[in-house]
């Protein structure tokens, strides 16, 4: 091997001396240049072997698209929490909804508020607003990304029973999914290609902190594969009234239909007649500390190929540890009416904590501790960059 490397070294030196006359002035650097070139060849061959092993995925197995800014998503999450708990029929709910719509508009999205009255489990009439923000609404080829934006009115899973009737701030269970969608909307406006209509605001939500987590994980921009402009539309839907499901302290029988009320309404009454999309991705609790996203059972049942697509994308961008190839449990969530009624294959990116005694959804689920102190930029980054990979790979 040493002899072969020396032969290669000699050939490279000879080639450089013959072809690059200016190199004569820097001949003392040639051995270093040659060794560097050989090292790059060896590294390249390792990369080729890895690509060959992945077969058909080799062509797409490179990070594409812009870097997701976790600091910006974190600030979007915090901004929602600053309104207080966004419980149904509250002023905080109305004010935050208006802010979300204006923020999407500022990133050039076409925004459609879908307002309706929905009946809660206890007969309470809920003033609900599904918020639909569309990138390039003129295109018929579309992808749906969704999350719920309301807060749980009761911390009924809190370890302290005295908190069970207090509202949840919902930093993770509500705000985190919307925050990721807002940052995606900002990046679509800036990098998506054909511009969206509306006001223009390409600034990140928060630039006061140091560089984004992505800078330490992803390849530098000049080493990443450039992506062509998107040729499809994207719809961001903020579903309302997801978390008004029957509380644990209430004995009223429930079959699961008291949850995801806004998604149920939209699926039966889409904002566009005959609306369809290639697929949908639901983001639920995507900012928690220590989160891992197992493959949810209903997602595997209705949209296994989309699960495979998203989990592969997480590996490509270096976040496979957040998306283990393990099966979780089945969840009653907004993706069910999207699958069953709207007939759009939709998956649920939702955490699974198999060893957490408080809840398999994590220690802060439906407790007063679901606040910004328990939001992790790394989790936001993992989910956001994975979605960038999915969108820019289409």
Model segments located where?
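Acidic/histidine-rich catalytic neighborhood of metal-dependent amide-processing enzymes
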Residues: 165-207, 215-219, 227-305
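A non-catalytic alpha/beta surface segment that caps or lines the substrate-entry region
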Residues: 78-79, 85-138
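Second-shell loop/turn segments in exported
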Residues: 62-67, 82-91, 118-121, 163-174, ...
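Catalytic-core environment of secreted peptidases
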Residues: 70-76, 83, 107, 129-189, ...
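C-terminal motif of bacterial Sec signal peptides marking the signal peptidase cleavage site
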Residues: 44-45
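Solvent-exposed loop/turn segments at secondary-structure junctions
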Residues: 87-88, 117-120, 137-139, 149-153, ...
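N-terminal capping segment at the start of a domain
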Residues: 51-96, 107, 357, 361-374
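Active-site-adjacent substrate-binding region
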Residues: 115, 125, 279, 286-394
């Amino acid at each position: 091997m040493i002899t072969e490397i020396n032969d290669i070294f000699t050939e490279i030196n000879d080639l450089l001396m013959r072809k690059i006359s200016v190199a004569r002035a820097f001949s003392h650097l040639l051995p270093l240049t040659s060794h560097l070139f050989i090292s790059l060849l060896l590294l390249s061959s390792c990369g080729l072997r890895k690509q060959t092993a992945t077969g058909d995925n080799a062509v797409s197995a490179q990070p594409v698209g812009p870097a997701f800014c976790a600091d910006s998503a974190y600030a979007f999450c915090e901004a929602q929490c600053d309104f207080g708990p966004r419980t149904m029929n509250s002023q905080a709910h109305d004010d935050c909804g208006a802010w979300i719509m204006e923020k999407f508009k500022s990133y050039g999205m076409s925004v459609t508020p879908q307002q309706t009255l929905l009946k809660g489990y206890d007969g309470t009439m809920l003033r609900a607003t599904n918020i639909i923000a569309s990138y390039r609404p003129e295109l018929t080829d579309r992808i749906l990304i969704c999350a719920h934006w309301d807060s749980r009115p009761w911390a009924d899973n809190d370890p302290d029973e005295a908190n069970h009737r207090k509202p949840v701030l919902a930093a993770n269970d509500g705000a985190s999914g919307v925050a990721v969608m807002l940052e995606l909307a900002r990046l679509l406006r800036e990098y998506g290609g054909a511009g969206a209509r509306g006001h223009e605001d390409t600034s990140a939500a928060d630039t006061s902190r140091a560089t984004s987590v992505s800078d330490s994980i992803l390849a530098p921009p000049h080493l990443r594969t450039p992506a062509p402009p998107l040729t499809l539309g994207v719809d961001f839907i903020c579903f309302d009234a997801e978390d008004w499901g029957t509380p644990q302290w209430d004995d009223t029988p429930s079959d699961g239909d008291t949850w995801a009320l806004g998604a149920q309404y939209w699926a039966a009454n889409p904002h566009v007649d005959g609306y369809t999309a290639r697929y949908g991705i639901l983001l639920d609790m995507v900012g928690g500390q220590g989160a891992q996203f197992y493959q949810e059972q209903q997602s595997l049942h209705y949209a296994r190929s989309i699960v495979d697509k998203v989990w592969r994308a997480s590996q490509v961008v270096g976040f496979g540890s957040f998306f283990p190839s393990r099966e979780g449990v089945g969840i009653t969530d907004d993706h069910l009416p999207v699958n069953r009624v709207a007939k759009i294959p939709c998956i649920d990116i939702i955490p699974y904590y198999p060893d957490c005694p408080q809840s398999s959804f994590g220690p802060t689920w439906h407790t007063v501790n679901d606040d910004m102190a328990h939001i992790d930029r790394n989790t936001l980054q993992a989910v956001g960059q994975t979605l960038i990979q999915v969108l820019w790979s289409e």
